[in-house]
A protein has these predicted regions:
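Short glycine-/small-residue-rich Rossmann-like dinucleotide-binding loops
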Residues: 69, 75-76, 95-96, 221, ...
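Glycine-rich phosphate/diphosphate-binding loop of Rossmann-like nucleotide-binding domains
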Residues: 6-42, 152-240, 287
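An N-terminal-biased, well-structured beta-alpha scaffold segment characteristic
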Residues: 2-106, 110
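Generic hydrophobic/aromatic pocket-lining and core-packing "Φ" positions
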Residues: 23, 47, 104, 142, ...
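Adenosine-phosphate binding glycine-rich loop
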Residues: 118-159, 269, 274-371
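Rossmann-like adenosine-cofactor binding region
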Residues: 209-291
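Glycine/serine-rich phosphate-binding loop and adjoining beta1-alpha1 elements at the start
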Residues: 2, 8, 77-169, 298-300
Length: 371
């Protein structure tokens, strides 16, 4: 199979779909790999590294799209890229379609085969291709939030871990999944006072077993969230409904009870955000203020650390890329129900139920669509 790796063109995105080491695995199996000129530069990979691994360097994205059977990316396709997709071409990347109606329409119209990293599952119904970037984003959320709390950034002027004789700040983490756990790892390491809200008592017990008395677990059904929001210095939004829009847990009215200069980091912004007042921002202009509350809503947080993120992502995605290249999409997906869960759009059909429901498309069962 011919596999193409274009440069990422989303604002301030420097990750790359495959590392030279991953390319080497593909070429060792007899596949051709075409990499756009300097696609890996931002993540620390040179053209020569890819050529040494057996790839060819293409001068433009158009060449990559035109000459490849499968496109492997990181972030959702931008409009210029959607226009280059063709019927039956495989696209393997993050998509987050429930929050992107225009992108979804473009992919449907292209009649390409669109497999989303974020909805591939495993035997335990976890999300193995979303988890690496969720871990990175969770860790970054505390760093970004702590920085945003500084006075020059518009924050309260508060050191999240406190100081000798000074109490630490309060961190409220919504969601005890991969984002929440990794946010708690950094927040507790910085000696903040950390609250984690989740609807699952079993998950909260797991987190308490890991963190002990360094966290305060809260069952979401048993609390008045507004009371905790009022005492929060840094709020992390890490809730997820796989493939669907995130629930709006924090309303605009709740902002009125928050402290002046407090900070919200909405990691769920890729799926529309879990805060009513969230809107996507970029690394170049990451924050805005509503009702005296700083909002940090960068939609590609892991893109700020492209070296770490690319290596972590490739460790998870490479086996699936190899499976697609070796078997083709029909055999690869038919033989693995967990992989089939990643199919979001196929030959003009929406094949992920949450996306179809959120955006008003007819849902076509993925096993039907590929056969």
């Amino acid at each position: 199979m011919k596999v193409g790796i274009p440069s990422e063109i989303k604002a301030q995105e420097s990750r790359v779909g495959l590392t030279p080491q991953s390319v080497q695995q593909l070429t060792n199996h007899g596949h051709e790999v075409l990499v756009e000129n300097n696609a890996g530069f931002g993540a620390g990979f040179e053209n020569a590294d890819y050529e040494k691994a057996g790839a060819k360097i293409a001068s433009s994205a158009a060449d990559v799209f035109n000459d490849s059977d499968m496109i492997v990316k990181v972030k959702e396709t931008q409009s210029a890229e959607v226009n280059m997709l063709r019927e039956n071409q495989i696209l393997f990347t993050y998509l987050h379609l429930s929050a992107a109606p225009e992108l979804t329409k473009g992919l449907v119209d292209s009649k390409s085969i669109c497999i989303a990293y974020e909805t591939v599952t495993d035997e335990n119904n976890r999300l193995p291709l979303l988890a690496p970037m969720s871990a990175v984003a969770g860790r970054m959320s505390i760093q970004a939030g702590a920085h945003s709390l500084e006075k020059p950034q518009g924050g309260r002027g508060l050191l999240i871990g406190g100081a000798p004789g000074v109490n630490p700040g309060n961190v409220l983490i919504l969601g005890g999944g991969v984002v929440g756990e990794n946010a708690a790892t950094i927040a507790t390491g910085m000696e903040a006072k950390v609250y984690i809200v989740d609807k699952s008592e079993a998950r909260l017990k797991e987190l308490q077993a890991k963190f002990g008395d360094r966290i305060i677990p809260l069952v979401s059904d048993d609390i008045n969230l507004e009371n905790y929001v009022a005492e929060t210095d840094l709020l992390i939004g890490g809730v997820l409904i796989p493939g669907a829009n995130a629930p709006k847990l924090i309303t605009k009215d709740m902002l009125k009870v928050m402290k002046r200069g407090s900070v919200i980091v909405d990691v769920a912004i890729d799926q529309g955000g879990c805060v009513e007042t969230s809107k996507p921002t970029t690394h170049a202009d990451p924050t805005y203020v509503i009702d005296d509350v700083v909002h940090y809503c960068v939609a590609n947080m892991p893109g700020g650390v492209p070296r770490t993120s690319t290596l972590a992502l490739n460790a998870a995605t490479l086996p699936f890329v190899l499976q697609l290249a070796q078997s083709g999409y029909r055999d690869a997906l038919n033989s693995d129900a967990n992989f089939l869960a990643g199919l979001n759009v196929c030959q003009g059909n929406v094949t992920y139920k949450a996306v179809a429901e959120d955006l008003g498309y007819n849902f076509v069962d993925p096993s039907t669509a590929i056969n």
